[in-house]
Amino acid sequence: RMFQDLSSFNQDIRDWVVSNVQNMSGMFQDATSFNQDIGGWNVSKVTNMSKIFMDAKDFNQDIGNWIVSDVIQMDQMFKNAVSFNQDIGNWNTTKVTNMGGMFRDATSFNQDVSKWDVSMVTNMQFMFDSSDLSSDNYDKLLTAWSQLTLKQAVVFTLGAVTYCNAAEARESMITTYKWRITDGGLDCSNLG
């Protein structure tokens, strides 16, 4: 939790060697001014990214090329990171078990994460609650994830996020895997 609660911290640390770090939990939590390029960091050995950018209100850097294939914990990773809206759709999430609250209150986040392999995830409670996830991106997510072999009885909470074209996929996840999905319901009024 190196920079936790350092609200004014915003130094250039792009050249830091973090290739042996395994736990980044809470690293930038409450570092409300931090917004530096760390997209080149080698995070391939990290297993815990829980709360890494929680309450990092200014952070909005491209970390889409991070190798997160060993990460197990992503819970509350971007919680209340109100500026973050970067493409992280190509992340390898095959080992992740906890995505609870990952984008909760991340009020700018609206990206396509439908390529994520969430077959090991057991907790998605409040994952997209009060995020800015669009119906289109939610539809893509439901359509893709319904094709995976998922864990049973996962709680998946999205607040007011609505779906339109993926009603069948959503129902399949509920019927086949007993997922408990809480969202804003069916709404196709925003389609152009």
Identify what each model region corresponds to.
Residues 1-192:
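Negatively charged
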